[in-house]
């Protein structure tokens, strides 16, 4: 008589997470292979939010394309607008007035804070802390009030223009923004008291999703993902675009490379952004907010009384100019990392090629490696610490 046979083969389970899972930060689908609660494999499935943004750019002038770009990373729209106008400005050698450059820096840093706040709330909710999720909307609402006063829109601002910005800052806006800066610093202190030394929070994030500096460089990571791994690299210091070199601020970085380090980098970055905004507001120069030279047009023929074009004689056309026949790569330091554009001009008002380098897409590549041999619950922590928006990942 023989005893019962034991099956030594592990029974693996395949679980679909997403594309409508509440912790997926958009329409991301993960096919996860589990052995009990241990993650054996993870395959991200992308493309649910693909809208052909690069192809649309090839059939639009730069000014026509500006409203589209705010739909890439719809939580940090100032950065997508900035990269869209910076590329043709460099291609056409267009000078930006000093006042416009200061206004741009203020808007970019406010947008960085808003993006980091809306990362912090859902990240904390993912790992079980609901309270900060409601707190972050107080400060974020104040930032959106500032955006609405200056641009007319709370989101999707369409504020940047080639050679400057669409409108000057309204009366009283600078004082209102300075008041917000003072208030927000107390808000960050409150968040850090609530979160940073909370033992349950530390259990969930410390030592989870570790990336070494060498790995971060090899995978092409950027932004807080790179700086949390011991690499002090920030394009605002490296490239010195706009007028960042005129302000006193420090690159924030950590050396541990885990989810806690990425949290600490983003929290410190918000403090540095406030420092930059305060210096820009206090030192903002006078002068024009746009370069009117860009708005020159070729002289059109005089319309006759019975001509079809006569009815459009009072319409103001959008400014166009030819993109010279050359290649150019332009980049900015967005909240999630290096946002870049590879632009090819072809003596036409339309770009011949408009390649987008989204930081979220590159940073997401390392997710399968990070979650292997981790617990199922750690997927939420690691994915949240990467900070992705599917609008820019899928484009």
UniProtKB/Swiss-Prot annotation:
Presence of keyword Translocase: yes
Membrane topology type: Peripheral membrane protein
Presence of keyword Chaperone: no
EC assignment: 7.1.1.-
Key words of the record: Chloroplast, Membrane, NAD, NADP, Plastid, Plastoquinone, Quinone, Thylakoid, Translocase, Transport
UniProt-annotated location(s): Plastid, Chloroplast thylakoid membrane
InterPro entries: NADH_Q_OxRdtase_suD, NADH_UbQ_OxRdtase_49kDa_CS, NDH1_su_D/H, NiFe-Hase_large
GO cellular component, as recorded: chloroplast thylakoid membrane
Catalytic activity, reaction form: a plastoquinone + NADH + (n+1) H(+)(in) = a plastoquinol + NAD(+) + n H(+)(out); a plastoquinone + NADPH + (n+1) H(+)(in) = a plastoquinol + NADP(+) + n H(+)(out)
Coiled-coil regions listed: none
GO molecular function: NAD binding; oxidoreductase activity, acting on NAD(P)H, quinone or similar compound as acceptor; quinone binding
GO BP annotations listed: photosynthesis, light reaction
Chief place where the protein resides: plastid
Pfam annotation, one family: Complex1_49kDa
Family classification: Belongs to the complex I 49 kDa subunit family.
Oligomeric form and interacting partners: NDH is composed of at least 16 different subunits, 5 of which are encoded in the nucleus.
Name of the molecule in the record: NAD(P)H-quinone oxidoreductase subunit H, chloroplastic
Organism (species): Lemna minor (Common duckweed)
